Amino acid sequence: MDSQEMIRLTQTVKKGGCAAKLPAGELKEVLAGMKPFRPKELIVGTETMDDACLWDLKDGRYLIQTLDFFTPIVDDPFDFGAIAAANAISDVYAMGGEPATAMTILAFPGGTLPLSLIRPLMDGALSVLSKAGVALAGGHTIDDETLKLGFSISGFVEKNKAWTNAGARPGDVLILTKGLGTGTITAALKKGEAQDSWIQGAIKSMITLNNITRHLKEIDIHSATDITGFGLAGHATQMALASQCTFYLDLNSLPFLEGAEECLEKGYLTRAHTTNANYTNDKTHWEISTQKESHWPEWKRKVVYDPQTSGGLLLALPEGEGQRALEIIKSLGFTQAQIIGKAKASENSTALRFNAI
């Protein structure tokens, strides 16, 4: 067994993947009142906490720019590289665009890990970048105490095909394209308590590109976001508020990965489960009656706060196009995709209502 095979990357960090994000509520509070330079070409910036920025190229297209990086969420360096790439690219798909170039962001603990690990990390990333048709154009590395890998991604979208998280309309149906549960499953992995089938299922989900945009060009997608570190509740809240809607979500329609139920029931949680709940609690309403109590196991409530890494897209679109869109998405291999709710007129500060369709 060589030195690489003996290293479990998850044991080198305290938290991994998008669960390592700073708490959304605290971050929003700290950044409140900032007034960055805002030229007219910047169409989407920081105001709605969207997945990427849109810059008007004045040729009928927007430039999409985003970046994402994080610490290891799995033990294998190839898998970690692939997940980091898929996660970064996802933001471009969430804006309705196609990715074009990538720049690497790598912090590497050269004093504690062999530099030879960098090659499988990048090989994994390249396997996904190449599949997405993304050119790796450069990058930057530093020596750091903790391994971190990510990418800055640039892409393009036609102006009339761009998606944002601010366009959902009352009456829209909401489609989620991937199952939930990567946060709790990888928390169990870190403790050595996750079954191999759970781990492999989560990895397969995380390295799956959200490249459905080109296949939905004939569907009138009103709004979109990708579900990552703030969980379904956090990102759906941002989308609902940005769209001035209230989202009615059916807890029993939510798709989840194999092992998510068992891991949540056994208490394999991250700090993000708590911070995501804190961020959304005052904007969320749970409709529970004594008669329904048996249908609301505690793990199903926790799964909406589960921090996803390279999670699915949440799409808002006209109800009449919902089934057609769902069939297209499922035909592309997203077998867990589901219609999980509806958008309705805004109810003051309530962004989400669970099990109230």
Task: Report each predicted region and the residues it spans.
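Glycine-/charge-enriched secondary-structure boundary and capping motifs
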Residues: 2-15, 26-29, 110-135, 142-147, ...
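Small-aliphatic-rich amphipathic alpha-helix that forms the alpha element of a beta-alpha
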Residues: 77-103, 120-131, 208-220, 225, ...
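N-terminal glycine-rich phosphate/pyrophosphate-binding loops that anchor nucleotide-derived ligands
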Residues: 1-94, 169-174, 179, 197, ...
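Glycine-rich anion-binding loops of enzyme active sites
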Residues: 57-74, 79-82, 98-194, 341-344
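Active-site glycine-rich loop that binds ribose-phosphate moieties when present
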Residues: 152-161, 197-216, 296
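Flexible, glycine/proline-enriched loop segments at strand-loop-helix junctions
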Residues: 16, 111-116, 162, 193-204, ...
